[in-house]
Amino acid sequence: IVGRQTWAKLMPYLKGYTTHTVRSGDTFFRLAQMYNTDMRRIMLANPTVNPQNLQIGTTLYIPFAFELVPTAVAYSSLLTAWIVEGLTVRYPFLQSSSVGKSVMGKDLLYLRFGQGEKEVFYNAAHHANEWLTTPVLLRFAEEYAESYVTGGQIGGTLAAQLFRTYSLYLLPMVNPDGVDLVTGILSSGGYYNRARQIANAYPQVPFPNGWKANIAGIDL
């Protein structure tokens, strides 16, 4: 069982960043060495901070150097929210908000890239047992953002050009309650019991692994 102190130690690595309060003698170079990251990432995550004039007591975001989006773990609504938060810290030009709430009150989070007039919308995890589309979309988001800051390309087109031309909206988990049911995060309680009652009418579909609908049994 993971206790509160263990979670507190793990959380920065799940979100991909930590924070640091500036002390006398701190520099971005020194902080990069201290946290095993690089100066570029620290500068990018703190766009309003002058690295030549660090103010004692200022709180800095310190992104780690590893890729944030895991692709070899089962996903949940919480993990998705942590990754969205981490991406917006690492790449502060990204915008994030919620388009609404799920049946169980979870935020339906989205990311916005770009400044263009042409609007494009991608989403993932409509069907609960197709949650694998969530890390696919989040990995795309991470690669796009990294390509933008490093002058790279996406599909043969400069990411900076795509950023200027399009406003891209990504909603990585349309059905968070259903995903939590399928991946085992939701395994008891009233919502779980009602979902099981619905599933009993379809014995040919394994429960919860085969569940596609939202937690109320409505196919999205």
Regions found by a protein language model. Name each.
Residues 12-36, 58, 64-67:
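Primarily a LysM-type cell-wall glycan-binding module
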Residues 22, 121-124:
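Short hydrophobic beta-strand that contains or immediately precedes a catalytic carboxylate
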Residues 41, 63-104:
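Short glycine- and acidic-rich boundary segments immediately preceding or forming the N-terminal edge
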Residues 43-50:
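Short acidic beta-strand-loop surface patches of small beta-rich interaction domains
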Residues 109-117, 125:
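Short beta-strand-to-loop junctions in surface cap/lid or active-site-entrance loops
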Residues 117-118, 131-220:
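Active-site/substrate-binding loop(s) of hydrolase catalytic cores
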